Each structure stands twice: as structure tokens, then as C-alpha cells.
């Protein structure tokens, strides 16, 4: 599915911090959405949590720096990091180039699958993105 110029795959969950989540049983792969990476701009630096780190939904689980923005990555779900994409620390632009592929950030073990209910499906996220775009156009 596309929303304006952004790719929004239908088989994923999304949050309002512009993360995508691909669930497989009790595990999930997490990355930044196409919309998120586009708004962030060229990503210059990423610091990711390491395997074994445990976090709650909404906790900081990394940091990011781009030409436009410096800030924290906020966990979309509670869990433990099983693996992080260390290649992104050497080449963070992979998030800009292939957000849903080589730009993945984490593989996590979910600690509360009920939190999936707080996430958006493709169509909900597409509507949210369209709303954000309209809001930005009205401001600028």
C-alpha cells in the first residue's frame, strides 16, 4: 500500500513513533518506517540496544542523529533484544535506503503480546500518515 509517496507494507504493525513491527510468534522484528526515515532525513548515526537488554513499551531503546534531528528511539513494544542490526551503526543510511529490508533495527522477544492491540494496521497507519502530512501542509 502507498500513502502519497510512502511505502506501507500490509503485513506489518505500526506505531505513532514511525516504527514498523513484523510479528512471528513471540518474536518481532522492528525498524523505522519509510515515512519515518523520510521525515528524519539522512541518518548519520544510530546507537542501538544490545542483545539481552530489556525494555518496556515507550522506553528509550536507542538513539538517532540525522541532518535534521537528534533524539531517542522509543520502544514500540515491551520485550528483550534478541539481536540488533549492528551493520546500521557502521552504515546507518541503510535505514534510508531499505527501511523494510536491510534497514531493520531489532529482533525482540515480546514480553506482553497484548500490547499489539495498541499498534496500527496498515490502513490505520496510512490514515495517520495522511493526517500528519495534512497537518504539516497547513503549518507550512
Language-model region placement:
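Residue-level recognition of specific faces of alpha-helices
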Residues: 45, 60-63, 72, 80, ...
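Short, well-structured beta-strand-loop connectors
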Residues: 50-64, 80-83
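Acidic, low-complexity mobile loops and tails
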Residues: 1-57, 97-98, 102-113, 118-140
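Mid-chain, well-packed structural core segment of small domains
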Residues: 67-102
Amino acid at each position: 500500500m502507498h500513502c502519497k509517496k510512502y511505502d506501507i507494507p500490509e503485513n506489518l504493525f505500526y506505531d505513532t513513533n514511525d516504527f514498523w513491527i513484523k510479528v512471528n510468534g513471540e518474536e518481532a522484528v522492528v525498524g523505522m518506517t519509510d515515512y519515518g526515515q523520510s521525515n528524519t532525513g539522512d541518518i548519520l548515526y544510530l546507537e542501538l540496544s544490545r542483545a539481552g537488554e530489556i525494555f518496556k513499551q515507550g522506553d528509550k531503546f536507542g538513539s538517532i542523529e540525522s541532518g535534521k534531528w537528534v533524539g531517542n528511539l522509543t520502544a514500540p513494544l515491551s520485550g528483550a533484544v534478541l539481536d540488533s542490526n549492528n551493520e546500521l551503526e557502521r552504515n546507518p543510511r541503510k535505514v534510508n535506503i531499505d527501511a523494510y529490508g536491510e534497514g531493520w533495527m531489532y529482533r525482540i522477544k515480546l514480553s506482553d503480546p497484548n500490547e499489539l492491540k495498541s499498534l496500527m494496521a496498515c490502513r490505520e497507519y496510512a490514515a495517520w500518515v495522511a493526517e500528519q502530512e495534512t497537518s504539516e501542509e497547513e503549518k507550512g
